[in-house]
């Protein structure tokens, strides 16, 4: 993973969020609906949502922080058009989000999300060694860890 690029993507997302670019759910700029960077942001937000669930905050604040970050991660997944263009980042974010919503007591939603995540992973060919052999070694190891 290119940490400098990830940091740049994160700063771009935070600046866009602060500027209100994501307030209108019916209008998504091309900058966020295309490209891989938003998948990285979704993964980061999902990780933060999971981490917030286990933080030292008192229960009401901890739950609210976790849910707020999970909502933002789902929003960035939508911006990444994850159903039509899945990636390793979006698959990983979905797995983390499924665990997070399971921990928040939404087991039915987590079960449905897991089924969707598995189908998206199969779309990428993560279930077969043959389909990932042409990928770079660092990506292959990530794909194997996800499946």
Residue ranges and their predicted role:
Residues 1-89, 96-106, 133-135:
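C-terminal transcriptional activation/regulatory domains of eukaryotic transcription factors
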Residues 1, 101-147:
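Acidic/serine-rich, low-complexity amphipathic helices located in mid- to C-terminal regulatory regions
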């Amino acid at each position: 993973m290119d940490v400098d690029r990830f940091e740049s993507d994160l700063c771009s997302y935070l600046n866009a969020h602060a500027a209100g670019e994501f307030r209108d759910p019916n209008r998504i700029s091309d900058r966020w609906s295309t490209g891989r960077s938003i998948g990285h942001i979704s993964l980061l937000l999902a990780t933060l949502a999971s981490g917030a669930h286990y933080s030292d905050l008192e229960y009401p604040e901890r739950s609210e922080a976790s849910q707020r970050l999970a909502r933002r991660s789902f929003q960035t997944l939508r911006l990444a058009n994850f159903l039509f263009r899945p990636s390793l980042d979006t698959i990983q974010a979905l797995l983390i989000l499924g665990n997070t919503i399971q921990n928040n007591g939404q087991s039915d939603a987590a079960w449905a999300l897991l089924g969707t995540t598995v189908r998206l992973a199969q779309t990428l060919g993560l279930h077969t060694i043959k389909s990932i052999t042409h990928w770079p070694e660092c990506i292959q190891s990530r794909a194997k860890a996800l499946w």
